[in-house]
Amino acid sequence: MLKPEWLRVKAPQRERIGAVADLLLDLNLNTVCQEASCPNIGECFAGGTATFLIMGPGCTRACPYCDIDFDKSVRELDPTEPERLGEAVARLGLKHVVITSVNRDDLPDGGATQFVACIEQVKQRSPLTTIELLIPDFCGNWDALATVMAAAPHVLNHNIETVPRMYRLARPQGIYERSLELLQRVRDDWPRAYSKSGLMVGLGETDDEVIDVLRDLRTHRVDIVTIGQYLSPGPKHLAVDRFVTPEQFDTYRRIGEEELGFLQVVSTPLTRSSYHAGEVQRLMASHPR
């Protein structure tokens, strides 16, 4: 299936990309931009931003839509990773940083303490930087969630990824209701935090199912939603079922913001969960907590 015109990405600024990539290489850090083959890597690297991927690069889950390598082996966490991440944030001069991770189901707390260590390093080295976490479901370990939230990230993101009907195919180790519960707990127990979630379209869902997911997310008090086109990483991954038009993406946005009352819905074909995440700062300023 050929990509439509609206999914073509502008050529990146090689000099700026090289500078960011060199810094990440120098500090031995992974980014989801690189590991997940994000289509926005040129724009984000050119803007001096990146979403850091900790505890990887291998993931203990093998979701068939994802380009991150599967690795079920038990691996020790790197105690120097948080310090190196904090240094990168300071050297890049980031106003807003996104920290995500692979799934680490081999760890009792799913890696919660590593998230906390990273938050502490960022706050120490770059105290004015706002912090957004994109976390896994911790297999429903709510103590692990509490550990992370006690470190006071400004934004807590957990992606719902797809509609419930597609979970068995696309996210076999995930549970739709568990992800909703996680998002609800964030807003109920830590009301000053902004909650965020995202989903892909083009996996085989219908537009009505997408709207139903938006309703579920709003019912569970989610503040911010991102919606983007699924692009298959390769022949061993799930195929694209359809290319959703920019007009339909705008319909999702309009329904989410105007009818359901989300603080923000970022919905375009190339949107990914941390795409233009720095705009969250403006949202926080206009809706302070």
UniProtKB/Swiss-Prot annotation:
Binding locations of [4Fe-4S] cluster 1: 33, 38, 44, 274
Pathway connected to this protein: Protein modification; protein lipoylation via endogenous pathway; protein N(6)-(lipoyl)lysine from octanoyl-[acyl-carrier-protein]: step 2/2
Keyword Nucleotide-binding (UniProt): no
Residues that, per the record, bind [4Fe-4S] cluster 2: 59, 63, 66
Location of the Radical SAM core domain: 45-263
Family label: Belongs to the radical SAM superfamily. Lipoyl synthase family.
Protein name from the UniProt record: Lipoyl synthase 1
Coarse class of the protein's main subcellular location: cytoplasm
Cofactor: [4Fe-4S] cluster
Gene behind the chain: lipA1
Pfam families in UniProt: Radical_SAM
EC number: 2.8.1.8
Molecular-function annotations in GO: 4 iron, 4 sulfur cluster binding; lipoate synthase activity; metal ion binding
InterPro entries recorded: Aldolase_TIM (IPR013785), Elp3/MiaA/NifB-like_rSAM (IPR006638), Lipoyl_synth (IPR003698), rSAM (IPR007197)
Note describing how the cofactor binds: Binds 2 [4Fe-4S] clusters per subunit. One cluster is coordinated with 3 cysteines and an exchangeable S-adenosyl-L-methionine.
Subcellular location: Cytoplasm
Database matches in SMART domains: Elp3
Keywords on record: 4Fe-4S, Cytoplasm, Iron, Iron-sulfur, Metal-binding, S-adenosyl-L-methionine, Transferase
